[in-house]
Amino acid sequence: MGSQTLPHGHMQTLIFLDLEATGLPSSRPEVTELCLLAVHRRALENTSISQGHPPPVPRPPRVVDKLSLCIAPGKACSPGASEITGLSKAELEVQGRQRFDDNLAILLRAFLQRQPQPCCLVAHNGDRYDFPLLQTELARLSTPSPLDGTFCVDSIAALKALEQASSPSGNGSRKSYSLGSIYTRLYWQAPTDSHTAEGDVLTLLSICQWKPQALLQWVDEHARPFSTVKPMYGTPATTGTTNLRPHAATATTPLATANGSPSNGRSRRPKSPPPEKVPEAPSQEGLLAPLSLLTLLTLAIATLYGLFLASPGQ
Protein backbone atom coordinates (compact mmCIF):
# COMPACT_ATOMS: atom_id res chain seq x y z
CA MET A 1 0.00 0.00 0.00
CA GLY A 2 1.39 3.40 -0.87
CA SER A 3 2.02 6.27 1.50
CA GLN A 4 -1.44 7.76 1.79
CA THR A 5 -3.84 8.61 4.58
CA LEU A 6 -6.50 5.98 5.11
CA PRO A 7 -9.99 7.18 4.14
CA HIS A 8 -11.53 6.15 7.48
CA GLY A 9 -9.16 8.24 9.59
CA HIS A 10 -6.69 7.38 12.34
CA MET A 11 -6.04 3.94 13.73
CA GLN A 12 -7.62 3.84 17.17
CA THR A 13 -5.93 0.70 18.50
CA LEU A 14 -2.44 -0.65 17.89
CA ILE A 15 -2.15 -4.36 18.60
CA PHE A 16 1.46 -5.39 19.10
CA LEU A 17 1.93 -8.96 17.92
CA ASP A 18 4.62 -11.60 18.20
CA LEU A 19 4.67 -15.28 17.24
CA GLU A 20 7.07 -18.04 18.18
CA ALA A 21 7.14 -21.04 15.87
CA THR A 22 8.72 -24.39 15.04
CA GLY A 23 11.32 -22.99 12.64
CA LEU A 24 12.23 -20.76 9.71
CA PRO A 25 9.96 -20.09 6.69
CA SER A 26 11.72 -22.71 4.55
CA SER A 27 10.67 -25.42 7.03
CA ARG A 28 6.93 -24.60 6.73
CA PRO A 29 6.71 -23.65 10.42
CA GLU A 30 3.72 -23.77 12.73
CA VAL A 31 2.95 -21.41 15.60
CA THR A 32 3.94 -22.47 19.13
CA GLU A 33 3.20 -19.21 20.98
CA LEU A 34 1.18 -16.09 20.28
CA CYS A 35 0.87 -12.79 22.13
CA LEU A 36 -1.29 -9.76 21.35
CA LEU A 37 -1.05 -6.51 23.32
CA ALA A 38 -3.76 -3.95 22.49
CA VAL A 39 -2.97 -0.30 23.25
CA HIS A 40 -5.29 2.62 22.54
CA ARG A 41 -3.98 5.49 20.47
CA ARG A 42 -4.47 7.92 23.35
CA ALA A 43 -2.20 5.87 25.62
CA LEU A 44 0.66 6.12 23.12
CA GLU A 45 0.08 9.82 22.50
CA ASN A 46 0.38 10.45 26.26
CA THR A 47 3.69 8.60 26.63
CA SER A 48 6.07 10.56 28.86
CA ILE A 49 9.38 10.96 27.03
CA SER A 50 12.59 11.72 28.91
CA GLN A 51 15.59 13.37 27.25
CA GLY A 52 18.18 11.79 29.55
CA HIS A 53 21.29 9.96 28.32
CA PRO A 54 20.68 7.13 28.26
CA PRO A 55 16.91 7.69 28.25
CA PRO A 56 14.96 5.50 30.65
CA VAL A 57 12.78 2.79 29.20
CA PRO A 58 9.20 4.15 29.09
CA ARG A 59 6.67 2.55 31.37
CA PRO A 60 4.02 0.55 29.49
CA PRO A 61 0.53 2.09 29.47
CA ARG A 62 -1.64 1.23 32.44
CA VAL A 63 -4.67 0.37 30.31
CA VAL A 64 -3.93 -2.52 27.93
CA ASP A 65 -5.59 -5.75 26.82
CA LYS A 66 -3.37 -8.79 26.46
CA LEU A 67 -3.86 -12.24 24.97
CA SER A 68 -1.02 -14.75 25.38
CA LEU A 69 -1.30 -18.40 24.36
CA CYS A 70 0.96 -21.41 24.00
CA ILE A 71 -0.06 -23.67 21.11
CA ALA A 72 0.74 -27.32 20.38
CA PRO A 73 2.05 -27.55 16.80
CA GLY A 74 1.36 -30.40 14.42
CA LYS A 75 5.07 -30.95 13.81
CA ALA A 76 8.26 -31.05 15.85
CA CYS A 77 10.19 -27.86 16.59
CA SER A 78 13.60 -27.57 15.00
CA PRO A 79 16.48 -27.91 17.48
CA GLY A 80 17.39 -24.27 16.91
CA ALA A 81 13.86 -23.04 17.53
CA SER A 82 13.53 -25.11 20.72
CA GLU A 83 16.84 -23.77 22.01
CA ILE A 84 15.85 -20.15 21.36
CA THR A 85 12.23 -20.26 22.55
CA GLY A 86 12.43 -22.97 25.21
CA LEU A 87 9.41 -24.70 23.65
CA SER A 88 9.04 -28.18 22.18
CA LYS A 89 6.14 -30.12 20.71
CA ALA A 90 6.43 -32.82 23.38
CA GLU A 91 6.43 -30.35 26.28
CA LEU A 92 3.50 -28.39 24.89
CA GLU A 93 1.47 -31.59 24.43
CA VAL A 94 2.30 -33.05 27.84
CA GLN A 95 1.02 -29.81 29.40
CA GLY A 96 -2.23 -30.10 27.49
CA ARG A 97 -1.77 -27.22 25.06
CA GLN A 98 -4.20 -27.29 22.14
CA ARG A 99 -3.73 -26.89 18.40
CA PHE A 100 -4.27 -23.71 16.40
CA ASP A 101 -7.95 -24.44 15.78
CA ASP A 102 -11.36 -22.84 15.24
CA ASN A 103 -11.69 -22.13 18.96
CA LEU A 104 -8.54 -20.05 18.84
CA ALA A 105 -9.89 -18.12 15.85
CA ILE A 106 -13.09 -17.43 17.80
CA LEU A 107 -10.96 -16.21 20.72
CA LEU A 108 -9.02 -13.89 18.41
CA ARG A 109 -12.26 -12.50 16.98
CA ALA A 110 -13.65 -11.83 20.46
CA PHE A 111 -10.41 -10.11 21.51
CA LEU A 112 -10.40 -7.87 18.43
CA GLN A 113 -14.09 -7.01 18.74
CA ARG A 114 -13.42 -5.58 22.21
CA GLN A 115 -11.00 -3.01 20.79
CA PRO A 116 -11.90 0.45 19.45
CA GLN A 117 -11.84 0.33 15.66
CA PRO A 118 -10.01 0.49 13.35
CA CYS A 119 -7.26 -1.78 14.68
CA CYS A 120 -3.77 -2.24 13.31
CA LEU A 121 -1.44 -5.17 14.02
CA VAL A 122 2.19 -4.14 14.58
CA ALA A 123 4.85 -6.86 14.32
CA HIS A 124 8.63 -6.71 13.96
CA ASN A 125 9.54 -8.32 10.63
CA GLY A 126 5.81 -8.89 10.32
CA ASP A 127 5.70 -8.61 6.53
CA ARG A 128 8.16 -11.47 6.10
CA TYR A 129 7.32 -13.73 9.02
CA ASP A 130 4.52 -13.08 11.53
CA PHE A 131 1.79 -11.92 9.14
CA PRO A 132 2.28 -14.62 6.45
CA LEU A 133 2.58 -17.35 9.10
CA LEU A 134 -0.56 -16.17 10.90
CA GLN A 135 -2.37 -16.03 7.57
CA THR A 136 -1.27 -19.62 6.86
CA GLU A 137 -2.57 -20.88 10.19
CA LEU A 138 -5.91 -19.13 9.69
CA ALA A 139 -6.22 -20.52 6.16
CA ARG A 140 -6.25 -24.09 7.56
CA LEU A 141 -9.44 -23.43 9.51
CA SER A 142 -13.08 -23.80 8.50
CA THR A 143 -14.14 -20.56 10.19
CA PRO A 144 -13.86 -17.16 8.45
CA SER A 145 -10.72 -15.21 9.28
CA PRO A 146 -11.12 -13.13 12.45
CA LEU A 147 -8.67 -10.60 10.99
CA ASP A 148 -10.85 -9.47 8.10
CA GLY A 149 -11.23 -5.72 8.58
CA THR A 150 -7.98 -5.46 10.57
CA PHE A 151 -4.91 -3.61 9.29
CA CYS A 152 -1.20 -4.31 9.72
CA VAL A 153 2.24 -2.69 9.54
CA ASP A 154 5.81 -3.95 9.87
CA SER A 155 7.64 -2.10 12.65
CA ILE A 156 11.01 -2.54 10.89
CA ALA A 157 9.86 -0.27 8.06
CA ALA A 158 8.41 2.21 10.56
CA LEU A 159 11.53 2.40 12.72
CA LYS A 160 13.82 2.73 9.71
CA ALA A 161 11.76 5.71 8.57
CA LEU A 162 11.77 7.30 12.05
CA GLU A 163 15.53 6.86 12.50
CA GLN A 164 16.28 8.27 9.07
CA ALA A 165 14.03 11.25 9.76
CA SER A 166 15.78 11.95 13.08
CA SER A 167 19.30 11.71 11.58
CA PRO A 168 19.09 12.08 7.77
CA SER A 169 22.87 12.02 7.26
CA GLY A 170 23.35 8.86 9.34
CA ASN A 171 26.73 7.80 10.64
CA GLY A 172 27.88 6.00 7.51
CA SER A 173 27.60 2.54 9.09
CA ARG A 174 25.04 -0.09 8.33
CA LYS A 175 22.62 -0.51 11.24
CA SER A 176 20.98 -3.67 12.42
CA TYR A 177 17.22 -3.54 12.73
CA SER A 178 16.73 -6.66 14.78
CA LEU A 179 14.46 -6.09 17.76
CA GLY A 180 17.29 -6.43 20.28
CA SER A 181 19.65 -4.16 18.33
CA ILE A 182 17.12 -1.32 18.08
CA TYR A 183 16.23 -1.59 21.76
CA THR A 184 19.90 -1.51 22.78
CA ARG A 185 20.61 1.42 20.45
CA LEU A 186 17.75 3.45 21.93
CA TYR A 187 17.98 2.57 25.63
CA TRP A 188 21.60 1.39 26.01
CA GLN A 189 20.65 -1.95 27.51
CA ALA A 190 19.58 -5.38 26.32
CA PRO A 191 15.88 -6.30 26.37
CA THR A 192 14.60 -8.86 28.83
CA ASP A 193 12.74 -12.09 28.04
CA SER A 194 13.81 -12.18 24.40
CA HIS A 195 12.26 -14.89 22.22
CA THR A 196 9.18 -15.28 24.33
CA ALA A 197 6.12 -13.91 22.57
CA GLU A 198 5.13 -11.71 25.51
CA GLY A 199 8.69 -10.50 26.13
CA ASP A 200 9.17 -9.53 22.49
CA VAL A 201 5.81 -7.73 22.40
CA LEU A 202 6.78 -5.62 25.44
CA THR A 203 10.16 -4.87 23.87
CA LEU A 204 8.43 -3.76 20.66
CA LEU A 205 6.02 -1.56 22.62
CA SER A 206 8.95 0.14 24.41
CA ILE A 207 10.64 0.83 21.07
CA CYS A 208 7.44 2.29 19.62
CA GLN A 209 7.14 4.59 22.66
CA TRP A 210 10.41 6.25 21.60
CA LYS A 211 8.64 8.62 19.20
CA PRO A 212 4.95 7.82 19.56
CA GLN A 213 3.53 10.78 17.62
CA ALA A 214 5.73 10.15 14.60
CA LEU A 215 5.02 6.42 14.81
CA LEU A 216 1.25 6.92 14.86
CA GLN A 217 1.42 9.22 11.86
CA TRP A 218 3.50 6.66 9.96
CA VAL A 219 1.05 3.88 10.85
CA ASP A 220 -1.93 5.94 9.67
CA GLU A 221 -0.23 6.50 6.32
CA HIS A 222 1.13 2.99 5.70
CA ALA A 223 -1.30 0.52 7.28
CA ARG A 224 -2.65 -2.05 4.83
CA PRO A 225 -5.51 -4.54 5.17
CA PHE A 226 -4.43 -7.84 6.70
CA SER A 227 -6.52 -9.56 4.04
CA THR A 228 -3.87 -8.54 1.47
CA VAL A 229 -1.20 -10.64 3.23
CA LYS A 230 -0.31 -13.81 1.33
CA PRO A 231 0.15 -17.05 3.31
CA MET A 232 3.72 -18.11 3.96
CA TYR A 233 3.04 -21.43 2.25
CA GLY A 234 0.12 -23.43 0.94
CA THR A 235 -1.83 -25.75 3.21
CA PRO A 236 -3.70 -28.90 2.13
CA ALA A 237 -7.05 -27.22 2.80
CA THR A 238 -6.08 -24.06 0.93
CA THR A 239 -4.54 -25.94 -1.97
CA GLY A 240 -7.51 -28.27 -2.28
CA THR A 241 -9.97 -25.41 -2.29
CA THR A 242 -7.96 -23.48 -4.83
CA ASN A 243 -7.57 -26.45 -7.14
CA LEU A 244 -11.16 -27.62 -6.92
CA ARG A 245 -12.82 -24.35 -7.83
CA PRO A 246 -11.43 -24.04 -11.36
CA HIS A 247 -12.24 -27.70 -12.05
CA ALA A 248 -15.81 -27.21 -10.85
CA ALA A 249 -16.24 -24.16 -13.06
CA THR A 250 -14.81 -25.99 -16.04
CA ALA A 251 -17.08 -28.97 -15.50
CA THR A 252 -20.18 -26.82 -15.12
CA THR A 253 -19.64 -24.82 -18.28
CA PRO A 254 -19.78 -27.68 -20.81
CA LEU A 255 -22.70 -29.25 -18.97
CA ALA A 256 -24.68 -26.06 -19.19
CA THR A 257 -23.81 -25.71 -22.86
CA ALA A 258 -24.71 -29.28 -23.75
CA ASN A 259 -28.00 -29.19 -21.90
CA GLY A 260 -28.88 -25.68 -23.09
CA SER A 261 -32.37 -24.64 -22.04
CA PRO A 262 -34.79 -22.85 -24.41
CA SER A 263 -33.76 -19.54 -22.89
CA ASN A 264 -30.20 -20.10 -24.04
CA GLY A 265 -29.18 -20.01 -27.68
CA ARG A 266 -30.59 -23.06 -29.40
CA SER A 267 -27.96 -22.88 -32.12
CA ARG A 268 -25.38 -24.06 -29.52
CA ARG A 269 -27.21 -27.34 -28.90
CA PRO A 270 -25.46 -30.31 -30.56
CA LYS A 271 -27.31 -31.56 -33.62
CA SER A 272 -28.90 -34.97 -33.22
CA PRO A 273 -28.74 -37.48 -36.12
CA PRO A 274 -31.84 -37.50 -38.35
CA PRO A 275 -34.39 -40.19 -37.43
CA GLU A 276 -34.46 -43.34 -39.55
CA LYS A 277 -37.18 -43.34 -42.19
CA VAL A 278 -39.97 -45.89 -41.68
CA PRO A 279 -41.79 -47.17 -44.78
CA GLU A 280 -45.19 -45.54 -44.89
CA ALA A 281 -48.42 -47.43 -45.63
CA PRO A 282 -49.81 -46.49 -49.06
CA SER A 283 -52.54 -43.91 -48.79
CA GLN A 284 -56.01 -44.17 -50.43
CA GLU A 285 -55.19 -41.45 -52.92
CA GLY A 286 -52.09 -43.34 -53.94
CA LEU A 287 -54.19 -46.41 -54.87
CA LEU A 288 -56.92 -44.56 -56.80
CA ALA A 289 -54.56 -42.90 -59.23
CA PRO A 290 -53.30 -46.07 -60.99
CA LEU A 291 -56.85 -47.59 -61.03
CA SER A 292 -58.25 -44.56 -62.83
CA LEU A 293 -55.51 -44.75 -65.43
CA LEU A 294 -56.20 -48.47 -66.02
CA THR A 295 -59.93 -47.78 -66.54
CA LEU A 296 -59.22 -45.13 -69.15
CA LEU A 297 -56.89 -47.43 -71.03
CA THR A 298 -59.54 -50.22 -71.04
CA LEU A 299 -62.21 -47.90 -72.43
CA ALA A 300 -59.87 -46.63 -75.10
CA ILE A 301 -59.03 -50.16 -76.27
CA ALA A 302 -62.72 -51.19 -76.33
CA THR A 303 -63.63 -48.14 -78.43
CA LEU A 304 -60.88 -48.83 -80.94
CA TYR A 305 -61.96 -52.48 -81.20
CA GLY A 306 -65.58 -51.47 -81.83
CA LEU A 307 -64.54 -49.10 -84.62
CA PHE A 308 -62.47 -51.83 -86.18
CA LEU A 309 -65.44 -54.23 -86.31
CA ALA A 310 -67.75 -51.62 -87.79
CA SER A 311 -65.43 -50.69 -90.64
CA PRO A 312 -66.48 -51.84 -94.27
CA GLY A 313 -65.18 -55.05 -95.61
CA GLN A 314 -65.16 -56.83 -92.28
UniProtKB/Swiss-Prot annotation:
Keyword Iron: no
Phenotype when the gene is knocked out: Mutant animals exhibit a dramatically reduced survival after weaning, with 50% of survival at 9 weeks or 17 weeks. In 6-8 week old animals, multiple organs show extensive inflammation. The most severe diffuse lymphocytic infiltration occurs in the heart, followed by the lung, the liver, the smooth muscle of the uterus and the salivary gland with periductal infiltration. Other tissues exhibit only minimal to mild lymphocytic infiltration. The heart phenotype includes inflammatory myocarditis leading to progressive, often dilated, cardiomyopathy and circulatory failure.
InterPro entries associated with the record: Exonuclease_RNaseT/DNA_pol3 (IPR013520), RNaseH-like_sf (IPR012337), RNaseH_sf (IPR036397), TREX1/2 (IPR040393)
Encoding gene, per UniProt annotation: Trex1
Induction text: Induced by cytosolic DNA. Induced by inflammatory stimuli in a cell-specific fashion. Up-regulated by IFN-alpha and IFN-gamma in B-cells and by LPS and viral and bacterial DNA (via Toll-like receptor signaling) in dendritic cells and macrophages.
Sequence positions bearing Phosphoserine: S78, S167, S261
Region listing for Interaction with UBQLN1, in residue ranges: 244-314
Impact upon substituting R114H: Reduces activity. Loss of endogenous retroelement metabolization
Cofactor note: Binds 2 Mg(2+) per subunit. The second magnesium ion interacts with only one residue. Substitution with Mn(2+) results in partial activity.
Matching PANTHER family: THREE PRIME REPAIR EXONUCLEASE 1, 2, THREE-PRIME REPAIR EXONUCLEASE 1
Name of the molecule in the record: Three-prime repair exonuclease 1
Family to which this protein belongs: Belongs to the exonuclease superfamily. TREX family.
Protein source organism: Mus musculus
Cofactor: Mg(2+)
Modification comment: Ubiquitinated, but not targeted to proteasomal degradation. Ubiquitination may be important for interaction with UBQLN1.
Source taxon at top rank: Eukaryota
Residues noted as binding Mg(2+) 1 in the record, renumbered to the chain: D18, E20, D200
Residues reported to bind Mg(2+) 2: D18
Binding residues annotated for substrate, in chain numbering: E20, A21, Y129, D200
EC number: 3.1.11.2
Composition-biased stretches (Low complexity): 248-265
Membrane protein topology class: Peripheral membrane protein
pH dependence: Optimum pH is 7.5-8.0.
Any one Gene Ontology cellular component term annotated for this protein: oligosaccharyltransferase complex
Subcellular locations according to the entry: Nucleus; Cytoplasm, Cytosol; Endoplasmic reticulum membrane
A GO molecular-function annotation: protein homodimerization activity
